[in-house]
């Protein structure tokens, strides 16, 4: 239960950091990857983080009335979701290899 609360806190901190700069996505991925038990969990946490941040970005665009314009810019939505997913998943995966919390398989 403590890990779940911690991960939710990391998601919120990463969202706050990514509002100012894209490095927040990497920092969030690093933190969730560090506290993951194995590689599969690190990839899932990185993917969930990226979808959470991108969903918040889409909600912000909808609030500002710019979502329709953003979605009509054909390659831009695809590039932005792929970059968001790649940054979070790769940083979570790399960090998991050096994590003391990861269960080492023999």
Curated annotation (Swiss-Prot):
Record localization: Cell membrane
Record bears the keyword Cell membrane: yes
TM helices/strands, residue ranges: 5-27, 42-64, 76-98
Primary site of residence: membrane
Topological type in the membrane: Multi-pass membrane protein
One annotated Gene Ontology cellular component of this protein: plasma membrane
Keywords: Cell membrane, Membrane, Transmembrane, Transmembrane helix
Protein name (record): Uncharacterized protein AF_0488
Source organism: Archaeoglobus fulgidus (strain ATCC 49558 / DSM 4304 / JCM 9628 / NBRC 100126 / VC-16)
């Amino acid at each position: 239960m403590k890990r779940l609360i911690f991960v939710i806190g990391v998601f919120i901190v990463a969202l706050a950091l990514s509002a100012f700069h894209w490095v927040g996505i990497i920092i969030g991925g690093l933190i969730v990857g560090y506290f993951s038990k194995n590689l599969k969990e690190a990839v899932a946490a990185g993917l969930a983080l990226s979808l959470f941040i991108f969903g918040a970005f889409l909600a912000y665009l909808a609030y500002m009335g710019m979502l329709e314009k953003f979605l009509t810019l054909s390659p831009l939505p695809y590039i932005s979701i792929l970059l968001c997913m790649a940054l979070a998943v790769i940083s979570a995966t790399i960090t998991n290899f050096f994590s003391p919390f990861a269960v080492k398989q023999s």
